[in-house]
Amino acid sequence: MLGDVASLAEELRVAAGQEPADLYIKNIQIVDVYTETIFSGSLVIKNGKIVAVNPGWEVEAKEVFDGKGRFAVPGFMDAHIHIEPTLLSPEALASVIVPWGTTTLFADPMEIANVAGLKGVEALLNNTENLPYQIYIEVPSRVPTAPGLETTGGVLGVKEVDQLLQSNISASLGELDPSKILSIKEEYLAKIVSARANGKVANGHAIGLNWDQLNVYATAGLSDDHESVVFQELFERLRLGIKALVREGSTERNVEALVKGAIEQNLSTENLIFCTDDKHVNDIVREGHISFNVQKAIALGLNPIKAIQMATINTAKHFRLDHYLGALTPGKVADIVLLDDLVEIKPAYVFKNGKLVAQGGKLTQQIEISQYPAFLNETVKLPPNLAPTSFALPSQGNRCKVNVINLYPDQIINFASQEWLNVAGGEVQVNTNEDILKLAVVERYGKNGSVGVGFVRGFKLKAGALASSVSHDHHNIVIVGTNDQDMDLAAREIARHQGGLVAVENGQVIGVLPLPIGGLMSSLPAEQVMSQIDQLNKKAEQLGCDLPAPFMTLSFISLPTVPELGLTDCGLIHVLEHRIIPTVVETE
């Protein structure tokens, strides 16, 4: 779509009315994100680009589309997404995001990078050229996220990061762990310098930072942050020139608090941008994608055009692509969404590069799922000596005090507490009555066979175990359970499928979703994946769990960059202190 001289000359002749257009969309209400107005008009399209708005000459076109008075808005953009946690391949993802009006993703493939390094990223991108949406990558900056505190399958150093930043498909340096900036790790500073040299912005991950720490982070050149949970955090970031990505994922529900605050404080939305970060396929199908962020903001009282700006032109400006994306004006790519109204954001028609790609909630053409390289289908290698005893936590005495990870509803952050648990047979016991369950992370790359064991509150399981090979960002096998035998079985079932989500009860596998592509993504169409997730969520509910997205929640407990605690295969991590702490702190 960058074009050449001949193509540009052709577009100019069409713009001047000298040659026929490819497509003429007439009888529409154009939502202008520059002037924040709506006007009746038409769009002339050539070579996938808008070349004229409301021309004063009679239009000739190969195809004429009557919008029948519908509202025309620019294609929606997700400013920060990880494709892998949708559990879909990029091809399968098209069927669930494009009908909701998403035409551009800014995606950080850190998940596949942590599993398989640069060749994993390249394999993922090899199958994206002919999709009905555009992918720009946020080049993974943290592979691994916490060196020395986790085991990963792949590593991306400065050389690999610089190579990806030089590519036209990259838009930015992906989110940087604050600890690397605050401790002035030169390897990570080199990645920021590379991004600047290549004309790319650097994305942030400023979770839990105070004002003084944010000053350091902003000085390093981190340009945005998607981790604001309350309005005060968003406001502080804006004050320091850090743009705020307003997130609504499966477990990170931040739109209401942040948009409400912006409305109440009469805050300009110019530097507010929508993203999803991590959202399961079933939530996208039921709610929408970026369209859901827009609709929710409008329902909260935000001016519809401002909400649309947060999904279009604000995003394009941030990534320095507003010469090409984000508005329905001449010279921009013809990514167009037609809506019946600006209250329920449910697209009637979606155009990508001037081609009709979705209508009435369905793609106009089926997308085939590609074959992925064999190395991505062979990423799970369990420790050879793994057994139920691998999940035991030895202790002296009759009871012991342990560090516990406590969940917050609808958030990925957690808080730490210390609780007393009984000891029997020399092993620490779970307490299902108090909802204190065992948590484990099993190294799955065949490197060291390490197993980290801890405790978590918030899952409310009364029996069995849940497990996932999606566990941020290292993507080892994370398991929550009431007993060691079911936890061991869950790990083995994941290995049998070379990745997946699993539910186990009393020595029986009661549910599984295989994720053979890197242990992260399914090779099935979206409808089948959605059905299997729904079944798994019901199985989790039968075991006592009342979380709306239990497997998404489980995947974040192992993240060593989200406060307060995280569990990896190396042990329990104090996130802000960036060190391993003991699970058992006292016995008696």
Swiss-Prot record:
Signal peptide (UniProt feature, chain positions): none
Cofactor: Mn(2+)
Keyword annotations from UniProtKB, A to Z: Hydrolase, Manganese
Domain of life: Bacteria
Reactions catalysed: adenine + H2O + H(+) = hypoxanthine + NH4(+)
Keyword Transferase annotated: no
GO biological process: adenine catabolic process
Positions in coiled-coil regions: none
EC number(s) stated in the UniProt entry for this protein: 3.5.4.2
GO molecular function terms listed in the Swiss-Prot or TrEMBL record: adenine deaminase activity
Keyword Hydrolase: yes
HAMAP family: Adenine_deamin (MF_01518)
Family: Belongs to the metallo-dependent hydrolases superfamily. Adenine deaminase family.
Protein name listed in UniProt: Adenine deaminase
Encoding gene per record: ade
